[in-house]
Amino acid sequence: MRPDDINPRTGLVVALVSVFLVFGFMFTVSGMKGETLGNIPLLAIGPAICLPGIAAIALARKTEGCTKWPENELLWVRKLPCFRKPKDKEVVELLRTPSDLESGKGSSDELAKKAGLRGKQLPQGPGEVPMASSVTTPTPTEEGECQSLVQSGRQEETSRYLDGYCPSASSLAYSALDAKCSAWDRSDRPEPEDSIFFVPQDSIIVCSYKQNSPYDRYCCYINQSQGRWDHETIV
C-alpha cells in the first residue's frame, strides 16, 4: 500500500480512464452551452463517455485494484443459483457433535428410530441378548424418570443374563460405567468410557433392572465386534 492508501493497480485504472473523464467533462460543458456534433447534442455524448470511467474507478477501489471480491457489495450476485454450493452430506454428519445430540439438536430422534429398527429387523439366537425396541435419553434433571429400553416380555430374561455376570453383591459397589471392577478380568475388555452421548451404529443396548440397588435401571451398550458370546461379555 502507498502512504495515500491507494492501490497501485487502482492508480493504473485511473490513469487509463482519465482520457475518457477529460473528454466526457469537456463534451458535457460544451453541451450545456448548446453545441452539437452534427445532429447529436454534446450534452448526450459527454455523460456517455464520462460515466463508464467513473464506474471503472469505483469498482477498482472496491476490489483493491481488481484483486479481491467485494465483501458487502454485489450480494445479489451470490444469491443466484449458479453461485450456490451444495452441502456435502458427509460434512453435515461430521458437524453433528455429541453436544448437539445431548441438547436435543441434530439426529437424536433419527438415532432412536434407527436403533429401534435394528432391534426389530435383526434375528435373535437362543444365547443372544435381546435387542432394544426403543431408545430414550433422559436428562440429568430426570433421574427418577427412565423409560424401558427392552420389551416388557424380555426384562426378566435380561435380568437373569446380567445376574450371571454381575452378582447382586458386586452391583451394589460398582456402576456399569465405573472403571474399577476388580471382580472382572480387565485384560479381555476395553476401557469403559466416562460418558456416552450416543449409541454406536453396530451395538446392542442392555438394561439392568434390579430392586434395592442404587443403580436401579442403568443402560449400556455392547459392541458386537468386541463381544464374545461363547466366553464372557463385559457390560
Curated annotation (Swiss-Prot):
A GO CC annotation recorded here is: membrane
* Annotated spans, Disordered: 99-146
Q: What is its main location?
A: membrane
Give the matching InterPro entries.
Answer: TMEM215 (IPR031486)
Q: Can the keyword Membrane be found in this entry's annotation?
A: yes
Which GO biological process categories is it annotated with? angiogenesis; negative regulation of retinal cell programmed cell death; sprouting angiogenesis
Recorded topology in the membrane = Multi-pass membrane protein
Keyword Transmembrane helix on entry: yes
* Signal peptide extent: none
Q: Which residues cross the membrane?
A: 12-32, 40-60
The record's keywords, sorted A to Z, are: Membrane, Transmembrane, Transmembrane helix
Localization: Membrane
Q: What is this protein called?
A: Transmembrane protein 215
Origin species, per record, is Mus musculus (Mouse)
- Gene name linked to the record: Tmem215
